[in-house]
Amino acid sequence: MRLKLATEHGLLTLLFLAHTSKSMTRRGDYVKTKDISFQCDISYEHLTKTVSILRKAGLLQTHAGREGGVELLPLSQTIRVGEVVALFEHPLVHPTTRYQLHALDQLCDAALISFFNTLNHTTIQQLADDLPPHFFFRTS
């Protein structure tokens, strides 16, 4: 199954924020979108779309201004990988054929359910915790 590039961007953004939130010591420390763009190798234009989708889904909050940026909301620590994939891939549909093959439709539906059940065994925070400390560390 091939996922959209936007899905990868959404997952990387959440992983980066979850990974870096451990090192943030003060409330009000926000991650700049330009930093996310650089460290995750996502174009700034694509990242702004990704951040907008994640904000509307209630997973992160944005703060405008010179000292602004992005922060994870507490709910994000428990969000499952499959939920993020579904957010960006919705609606997932199985391939259609020229023939009405009910058995094939059922098989594809079962495969999608299995796919999401597997992804939903892991949270974004669990993935972030398993990353090496300098996973997102890029220098110009």
Predicted regions and their residues:
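N-terminal helix-turn-helix DNA-binding core of bacterial DNA-binding proteins
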Residues: 3-42, 71
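Alpha-helical residues within the helix-turn-helix
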Residues: 38, 55-56
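Key DNA-contact positions within bacterial/archaeal DNA-binding proteins
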Residues: 45
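Short, hydrophobic-biased segments on the C-terminal half of alpha helices
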Residues: 51-52
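Beta-hairpin "wing" of winged helix-turn-helix
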Residues: 57-66, 71-72
